[in-house]
Curated annotation (Swiss-Prot):
PANTHER family: MOLYBDENUM COFACTOR BIOSYNTHESIS PROTEIN 1, MOLYBDOPTERIN COFACTOR SYNTHESIS PROTEIN A. It comes from Methanothermobacter marburgensis (strain ATCC BAA-927 / DSM 2133 / JCM 14651 / NBRC 100331 / OCM 82 / Marburg) (Methanobacterium thermoautotrophicum). Binds 2 [4Fe-4S] clusters. Binds 1 [4Fe-4S] cluster coordinated with 3 cysteines and an exchangeable S-adenosyl-L-methionine and 1 [4Fe-4S] cluster coordinated with 3 cysteines and the GTP-derived substrate. InterPro entries: Aldolase_TIM, Elp3/MiaA/NifB-like_rSAM, MoaA_arc, MoaA_NifB_PqqE_Fe-S-bd_CS, MoaA_twitch, MoCo_biosynth_MoaA/MoaC, rSAM. Its EC number is 4.1.99.22. It is an enzyme of class 4 (lyase). This is Probable GTP 3',8-cyclase. One of its GO terms (molecular function) is 4 iron, 4 sulfur cluster binding. It holds the Pfam family Radical_SAM. GTP binds at residues 15, 62, 92, 153, 254-256. It comes from the Archaea. Pathway: Cofactor biosynthesis; molybdopterin biosynthesis.
Length: 305
């Protein structure tokens, strides 16, 4: 069955944060809008979450964090999810551990990957992440492409005064790798401090205008919040706008899950979560289904600050 919320939006995708842990400390990180927790679901818990989601019509699963590849059992998690029969399984990662895991993850059933990578300059990478992992990330991107994960997308958060001047260099890097560049406008959430947004926020409207002028073709992704994709030669660029807007909400078909098993109806809210811990611990899949339906009922037609 395909469930819809009270605003006629189908539930198509599930984004599961499998851990709050990370091996870098990005200056802008909002941890997928999720508040800190030391608890993590087991692979079996994640499998049960996904089985119920599949029964309700979910077709796509994305794993995120924290840094999902930091989990020793991430390949097992992907295998369990893949056994259910989803149309698409993807991961968002910082890429530092991707080189050695690309093939095992592909063999486990992973379809594609998004790599958070904001700069090609070692000193800027160090400033953003507090680590010296730039070459490891490059190797991870190359490994993902060679493994046949498709598409490989590079998530570049634009930061004023930090990397806003590197967009075309990153576009060329992605084009040469056979990857898609995603330009992301900095997002404010409960877990991202206001002063960070004010300091680094860069309006990407002029960037998008430049892309439109240079593009050979422009495509609008209707079920991805009317996101624009620009085709320039043999390269591709997508633009991701902040999510606290009516267009984003009107086309939202996603539910999120926190590392400790709470269903999250809205990326930007933490006041309407649905806790599945008891149902997961007892293996009560029917109870878990009812909790999913409750989370779907709590979805709003637009973001309420």
């Amino acid at each position: 069955m395909q469930v819809h919320d009270n605003h006629r939006r189908p539930l198509v995708s599930l984004r599961i944060s499998v851990t709050g842990r990370c091996n870098v400390s990005c200056i802008y990180c909002h941890r997928d809008g999720i508040l800190r927790s030391d608890e993590e679901m087991s692979p079996e818990d994640i499998e049960n979450i996904c089985r119920v989601a599949s029964d309700l019509g979910v077709k796509k699963i994305r794993l995120s964090g924290g840094e999902p590849l930091i989990r020793d059992d991430i390949v097992e998690i992907v295998e369990k999810i893949n056994s259910i029969g989803f149309r698409d399984i993807s991961i968002t990662t910082n890429g530092t551990l991707l080189e050695d895991l690309s093939v095992p993850l592909r063999d486990a059933g992973l379809d594609r990957v998004n790599v958070s990578f904001d700069t090609l300059k070692p000193e800027t990478y160090r400033f953003i992440t507090r680590k010296d992992y730039l070459e490891r990330v490059k190797a991870g991107i190359e490994g993902a492409v060679m493994a046949g994960l498709d598409p490989v997308k590079i998530n570049m958060v634009i930061l004023r005064g930090v990397n806003h001047h590197e967009i075309w260099d990153m576009f060329e890097f992605c084009r040469q790798q056979g990857a898609v560049l995603q330009i992301i406008e900095l997002l404010k959430t409960d877990s991202c401090p206001d002063n960070g947004v004010e300091r680094y926020h860069c309006d990407i409207t002029p960037i998008e205008a430049e892309l439109a002028e240079m593009a050979d073709r422009i495509m609008t992704r209707k079920f991805m919040q009317d996101r624009k994709k620009y085709f320039i030669g043999d390269g591709e660029v997508e633009v991701v706008r902040p999510m606290d807007n009516t267009r984003f909400c009107a086309n939202c078909t996603r539910l999120r899950v926190t590392p400790d098993g709470k269903l999250k109806p809205c990326l930007l809210r933490n006041d309407n979560l649905v806790d599945t811990k008891e149902a997961l611990s007892s293996g009560d899949l029917e109870g878990l289904r009812e909790l999913f339906l409750e989370a779907i009922r709590r979805r709003s037609p637009y973001y309420q600050s």
